[in-house]
Amino acid sequence: MRYVASYLLAALGGNSSPSAKDIKKILDSVGIEADDDRLNKVIS
């Protein structure tokens, strides 16, 4: 859920196609580590 929420935050912020790096940056800002496998499933 955290990955979907981060993706949606990036999209609402004006990024029409958020990358994994964008989502990781959002998660890092609140102290959450990103799992690359799960993150890539959300992006693809």
Swiss-Prot record:
Q: Which residues carry this modification: N6-succinyllysine?
A: K21
- InterPro entries, alphabetized: P1/P2_N_sf, Ribosomal_P2
Q: Which CDD domains match?
A: Ribosomal_P2
User: Phosphoserine occurs at which residues?
Assistant: S17, S19
Q: Which residues are reported to carry the modification N-acetylmethionine?
A: M1
Q: What post-translational events are described? A: Phosphorylated.
Q: What residues bear N6-acetyllysine in this entry?
A: K21
Q: Name one GO biological process term.
A: cytoplasmic translational elongation
**Which positions form S-S bridges?**
none
Q: Which UniProt keywords apply?
A: Acetylation, Phosphoprotein, Ribonucleoprotein, Ribosomal protein
What would be one Gene Ontology cellular-component term for the protein?
cytosolic large ribosomal subunit
Q: Name one GO molecular function term.
A: structural constituent of ribosome
What's the stated role of this polypeptide? Answer: Plays an important role in the elongation step of protein synthesis.
PANTHER family (UniProt xref): 60S ACIDIC RIBOSOMAL PROTEIN FAMILY MEMBER (PTHR21141), LARGE RIBOSOMAL SUBUNIT PROTEIN P2 (PTHR21141:SF5)
Tell me the subunit arrangement.
Heterodimer with RPLP1 at the lateral ribosomal stalk of the large ribosomal subunit.
Q: Which family does it belong to?
A: Belongs to the eukaryotic ribosomal protein P1/P2 family.
The name this protein goes by in its record: Large ribosomal subunit protein P2
Q: Which organism is it from?
A: Oryctolagus cuniculus (Rabbit)
Instruction: Give the classification, highest ranks.
Output: Eukaryota, Metazoa, Chordata, Craniata, Vertebrata
> What's the gene?
RPLP2
